[in-house]
């Protein structure tokens, strides 16, 4: 399931250090010649494709990327220190454009691909360079150049790592809203989600994954009923399915029958999809007393003879969602997608 994510960021390379105006001053050498050193080059900003980075979410928190300035030159022919380059990891498949001109700067396709997006300013020259037979005490220096600065647009075709399963109104949209920046339409009636929504879940710095909420499935979806059939095929590209189950349905329906209906649709649509790793997530546990919720969850597990991972959450109250997201991140890192 591919979606285009984008981010905007300003990059500023470091300025070059200025050249030094200095003369040799030592005992018994009253008229020492020039000894001003050169400045250091400014640091550049590089993007590097890193397979451990999945999304552009980091650029929502850091909109300015700045490399170090070069240090000025010093006396005794000492050069200034070069500014440190700024190396920024980006996901594989990132495309970089100049925001103002829409010029394509480059693509980062394979792990280790490196792209200079702002080059550091060239160092200035000390007065030593301007000594001549007619000018033994030059007072001329050259200042360091300014580093490049530009506004960039980054694009990434996202491949969803986790897909959400569940009947309409199971709470999938509420869940994706609770754990990510996605804002799907949420209401208490079936088919609230009319098209896929994508959310980026940020667990820690440079640890994030992509989760997709598709329209709720109903019985017969694999044959064209409801809204989910045209999106079922996209779930085959995900690594893991979260089966969201409403344990307190307002219509009094049986959660076990709801789960079995979804499983049946998966099996009819694709054997590969039905065998994909799937975790059971009981939602809306806040609507029941704790002992009743526990008993109902256990009853469902027993009736299904479920052997896989089980989580109990309240998406609307964000109860249990943090642990689930950390476990999802660990699973995805352990079973990293081959690109």
Swiss-Prot record:
Its EC number is 3.6.5.-. Residues 160-333 form the OBG-type G domain. One of its GO terms (cellular component) is cytoplasm. Keywords: Cytoplasm, GTP-binding, Hydrolase, Magnesium, Metal-binding, Nucleotide-binding. It is an enzyme of class 3 (hydrolase). Its cofactor is Mg(2+). GTP binds at residues 166-173, 191-195, 213-216, 283-286, 314-316. CDD domains: Obg (cd01898). The keyword rRNA-binding does not apply. Its main location: cytoplasm. Mg(2+) binds at residues 173, 193. An essential GTPase which binds GTP, GDP and possibly (p)ppGpp with moderate affinity, with high nucleotide exchange rates and a fairly low GTP hydrolysis rate. Plays a role in control of the cell cycle, stress response, ribosome biogenesis and in those bacteria that undergo differentiation, in morphogenesis control. PANTHER family: DEVELOPMENTALLY REGULATED GTP-BINDING PROTEIN-RELATED, MITOCHONDRIAL RIBOSOME-ASSOCIATED GTPASE 2. Monomer. NCBIfam families: Obg_CgtA, PRK12297.1, PRK12299.1. HAMAP family: GTPase_Obg (MF_01454). This is GTPase Obg. It comes from Coxiella burnetii (strain RSA 331 / Henzerling II). The lineage of its organism: Bacteria, Pseudomonadati, Pseudomonadota, Gammaproteobacteria, Legionellales.
